[in-house]
Amino acid sequence: MNAPLGGIWPWLPLLLTWLTPEVSSSWWYMRATGGSSRVMCDNVPGLVSRQRQLCHRHPDVMRAIGLGVAEWTAECQHQFRQHRWNCNTLDRDHSLFGRVLLRSSRESAFVYAVSSAGVVFAITRACSQGELKSCSCDPKKKGTAKDSKGNFDWGGCSDNIDYGIKFARAFVDAKERKGKDARALMNLHNNRAGRKAVKRFLKQECKCHGVSGSCTLRTCWLAMADFRKTGDYLWRKYNGAIQVVMNQDGTGFTVANKRFKKPTKNDLVYFENSPDYCIRDRDAGSLGTAGRVCNLTSRGMDSCEVMCCGRGYDTSHVTRMTKCECKFHWCCAVRCQDCLEALDVHTCKAPKSVDWAAPT
């Protein structure tokens, strides 16, 4: 019994490194890094050489990406607001989400997709606002074109989403492309699904010109929809995410359950089932649901029964200031009174184990 273990022991650290996936998107930490571009590029942990090259070469793009982190994390938290895992971030952790994303779960699939989408959105918006040296409005949208309503002229500033997608692919995917393992392929797939989701909601907007708005002439441009549309779409993909396994040659996926269809480029994929997130678990990165607010009248994921994992809940009586007796005044204002409202707040009980609140 001891001989095989003795032979394996020197290689154990390497084996553990290979078996344990790494939370590779260290660029997520860019939201917390200030200072000059050189300071930022050299102090974000975990960036690969290609990412550092792009960081030094395009500091204005990096600033846009860093500002965008707050936007897509807020979107993630909005989508998961009624779930046991609520996309909570850890300020002192360079992976931003802690160990929870080490598992190749549905939640990891969503976070990689929405973060990749957030980079596309942030860069494309910065291009249109004239904040970047390397891009501007879409140069291809010039001259005359035709749609179902007739001819129109390209004008205004069409969002240059192709540039946003190209840069996001080069920067976000750089670290995954260095890996050959299953998790890297999963991340690449979900990153691409996120980028495609933003382009899906690119819409044509037009302005009419002519006597009394007769629309004898139209000027049109392409504009991204609000990021909430992308978030809602990816949330639907999260709920329909497809569990996969690596194929035999290690180059792609097959569905884990043969009854399900093969995933498309728009679908999210994952390998491992999620933990229940009921209790604090250091290894799983779960903070648990003790102290979370629950909805006593709901039958959904935010219900006290589901959110509290059957542990029960505490009720506290609180008062809050709200707007009331609002009236419309001509013209054009709405005036309200400040009123105190009494309500009950229900929060999940802690597990009976004495160590549930130990810091992670």
UniProtKB/Swiss-Prot annotation:
Lipidation (O-palmitoleoyl serine): 212
Keywords: Developmental protein, Disulfide bond, Extracellular matrix, Glycoprotein, Lipoprotein, Secreted, Signal, Wnt signaling pathway
GO molecular function terms noted in the UniProt entry: cytokine activity; frizzled binding
CDD domains reported in the protein's UniProt record: Wnt_Wnt2
Functional summary from the UniProt entry: Ligand for members of the frizzled family of seven transmembrane receptors. Functions in the canonical Wnt signaling pathway that results in activation of transcription factors of the TCF/LEF family. Functions as a upstream regulator of FGF10 expression. Plays an important role in embryonic lung development. May contribute to embryonic brain development by regulating the proliferation of dopaminergic precursors and neurons.
Annotated family: Belongs to the Wnt family.
Full protein name: Protein Wnt-2
Native source species: Felis catus
